[in-house]
Amino acid sequence: MRQIVPKVVVVGAGMGGLASAIRLARAGCEVTLLEAREAPGGRMRTLPSVAGPVDAGPTVLTLREVFDDIFEVCGQKLDHHLTLLPQPLLARHWWLDGSTLDLTTDLEANVEAVAAFAGAREARAFRRFHDLSARLYDAFDRPMMRAARPDLRAIATGALKAPRTWPALLPGMTLDRLLRLFFRDRRLRQLFGRYATYVGGTPYGAPGVLALIWAAEARGVWAIEGGMHRLALALARLADDQGVRLRYGAPVARILRQGGRATGVQLADGRTLPADHIVFNGDPAALLAGCLGDGPQDAVPEDRIHPRSLSAWVWSYAARASGPPLVHHNVFFADDPRREFGPIAAGQMPEDATLYICAEDRSGGQLPDGPERFEIIMNGPPGRPAKPEDFAQCRSRTFDRLRQFGLTFDPVPGETSLTAPSGFASLFPASQGSIYGLSPHGALASLKRPLARTALPGLWLAGGGAHPGAGVPMAALSGRHAAEAILADLASRSR
C-alpha cells in the first residue's frame, strides 16, 4: 500500500518557521515554506549600507546548542556552515559620569571588575546575584524553555529544591525590586534591570524570574562572521538541502478552513495550496485581527496576545566612529531610568534613553579600516503612530546623547537608516510595532504565551510570539516544538 506523504505549509521564514520546516522535512513531510519578503530571517533582517548589509534586528546569539542541534538532526555541523566567534567580553557598559564596566563569561573576572567599579560590598552582592541567576536558569531551563508546554510540577519541584530562588518567585516581585535586595549601587541595578528589555518589558513591570537572563548570557555569547542575518541564510540553505520548497515573494492572504480544520492557504495572487498541517510563523495577533481571513480568527485567545511588549527605534547604518573604544556590544545608560520608561509607558519617545550599540565589525577584536556597520537600539512603546517630528527628535536623542559620551559618527545616518515603531508595525501585521509579542509583565506572563497547538486543528504556531518566547534561540525552540507536535499528531493518527 502506497504511503501518503503529509503536506505541510509553513508561513514565514523566520527562525521558528525555518526550524520547523527543517525538522518536518527531515522526518519525511512534504514541506513548502512561504515568505512574503525576498529573503529569509523574519525579524532577523538587514538594511543596505556602504559597508555591506547591516543587521536591523537581533544582535545577540546565546544558547548556541539550540542551533547545533538543528544541524546535527540533519547529520551536519553548524561550524561547517557559519563562522561563530565566541565573545568572552559580553558587553561594555558606559555612564555619563565616566564610569565603565566590562562583563565577561569569567565569574571571577567579573567579581574583580565589580569590586573595582563599585566596591567590595557590591562585588559580594554580584556573586550572590550570579548564584541566584544560575539557580533560576537551572530551575526553568528544561521544564519551561525547552518543554513544549510549561511543566508546572517540574518547575515547582525545582524551585522547592533551590530555596535561594524563592525571593525571585514571590508574588509582586519585579526585577527592579529583586535587584534592590542585592545592589545598593544604582548603576548595577540599572545594568541588570535592562535584561527586562530583552523580552520587551521594563524592570518595573517584569517579574524577578527574568534575572535568569544573566545566566543565559554568562554561559556564552557568539557573534556571526558577516552578521546575524547569515544564520537565517544558513538555515535556509539547510532547509533547501532537506527538500523544503522555499518560495520568497509569496505573501499569504488567507488560511483556509473547512470542516473545523485548517486545510490550506491562499496566496495574495489567488493561488491556493492545500495542506494537512500549517505552521504560522508570525505574530499570533495577525490571526486574531483577521489578517489571514476569518478562518483562524478564533485560533488563539486574546489574553495570549495582549497586552503588547515594547517596540524600538532602530538605526542600521555604516559610518566612521570616533571616541571611546567600542566593542561588539555596548550600552550607554540613561541618567534616570524613570525618564526612559515613564514616557514609554505613556506612549512617547523616551526623554533620557539608554542606547545599545552593536559594532558588528568589531567581533574579531580588530578596528575596521574604513566605514563600519552599526546598529543602535532605543526602546519605544508599541502602538505609536508615526509623527512628523519623530525622525528629527529620535536623531537628536540618539546622536546628541552619544556625543555627550564623546562618541561621534561620520556621517550621521539619515532617515532611510531608521526603523521606527510604526515601521515595525508595517513590517509585521497586527503587531502594533511590538517586537517581542506578549508583554512579559506580571508573574504569570511567561505561562500565558500561546503554545504550538492552536484551537484550530491543523494550525500550529512558531516564532517569538509563541512559547517559549522572544529571542533568537527561543524562536528556534518554538519551531522545534511545532514540528514535534505535528509529528506526534501524525503518529497518533497512523495507529
From Swiss-Prot:
One of its GO terms (molecular function) is oxidoreductase activity, acting on the CH-CH group of donors. The keyword Oxidoreductase applies. Keywords: Carotenoid biosynthesis, Chlorophyll biosynthesis, Oxidoreductase, Photosynthesis. Gene3D superfamilies: FAD/NAD(P)-binding domain (3.50.50.60). Its EC number is 1.3.99.27. GO terms for biological process: carotenoid biosynthetic process; chlorophyll biosynthetic process; photosynthesis. Pathway: Carotenoid biosynthesis; spheroidene biosynthesis. InterPro entries: Amino_oxidase, carotdesatCrtD, Carotenoid/retinoid_OxRdtase, FAD/NAD-bd_sf, Phytoene_DH_bac_CS. It catalyses: rhodopin + A = (3E)-3,4-didehydrorhodopin + AH2. Belongs to the carotenoid/retinoid oxidoreductase family. It prefer the acyclic carotenoids such as 1-hydroxylycopene, and 1-hydroxy-gamma-carotene, whereas 1-hydroxy-3,4-didehydrolycopene and 1,1-dihydroxylycopene are much less effective. This is Hydroxyneurosporene desaturase. The lineage of its organism: Bacteria, Pseudomonadati, Pseudomonadota, Alphaproteobacteria, Rhodobacterales. The gene is crtD.
